[in-house]
């Protein structure tokens, strides 16, 4: 149970200690995706949004910070990351959907892929 875990983490925290939680931003995500990947990513981000509400409810004094990273990657490297399922929303994607998705990425993007990757950091200080 997340409530129990947050309470335990908060109680175990030393004075001036911090809890940091990192996630992709849940809105306007710019990660290059194929259709099935986008669907899974949006589903995962909705779950994250619900978790953030629980975190906010349990940890009263939290702050939010966004970290923006300008990503430049070759399409070849990005496809390798997809094949290796480095992005968690790809873990449940079938091999067939992965192959079709890679074909979609090949058609959709240039040799160099550029996008803004934004991480949300939720921090709690004791």
Where are the model-predicted features located?
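Conserved class I S-adenosyl-L-methionine
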Residues: 18-48
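Short alpha-helix
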Residues: 44-59, 78, 100
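Conserved Class I S-adenosyl-L-methionine
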Residues: 62-126
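A short glycine-rich, Lys/Arg-flanked "PGG" loop and its adjoining helix->strand segment in the class I
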Residues: 3-15
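Short conserved AdoMet
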Residues: 14, 56, 126
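Phosphate/oxyanion-binding loops and surfaces in catalytic or ligand/nucleic-acid-binding neighborhoods
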Residues: 12, 58, 85
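A short SAM/SAH-binding and catalytic strip from SAM-dependent methyltransferases
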Residues: 1-4, 25
């Amino acid at each position: 149970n997340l409530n129990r875990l947050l309470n335990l983490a908060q109680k175990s925290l030393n004075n001036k200690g911090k809890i940091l939680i990192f996630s992709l931003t849940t809105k306007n995500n710019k990660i290059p995706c194929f259709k099935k990947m986008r669907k899974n990513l949006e589903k995962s981000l909705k779950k994250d949004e619900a978790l953030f509400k629980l975190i906010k409810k349990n940890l009263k004094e939290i702050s939010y910070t966004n970290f923006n990273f300008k990503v430049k990657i070759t399409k070849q490297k990005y496809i390798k990351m997809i094949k290796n399922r480095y992005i968690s929303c790809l873990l449940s994607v079938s091999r067939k959907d992965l192959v079709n998705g890679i074909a979609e990425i090949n058609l959709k993007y240039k040799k160099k892929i550029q996008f803004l990757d934004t991480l949300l950091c939720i921090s709690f200080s004791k």
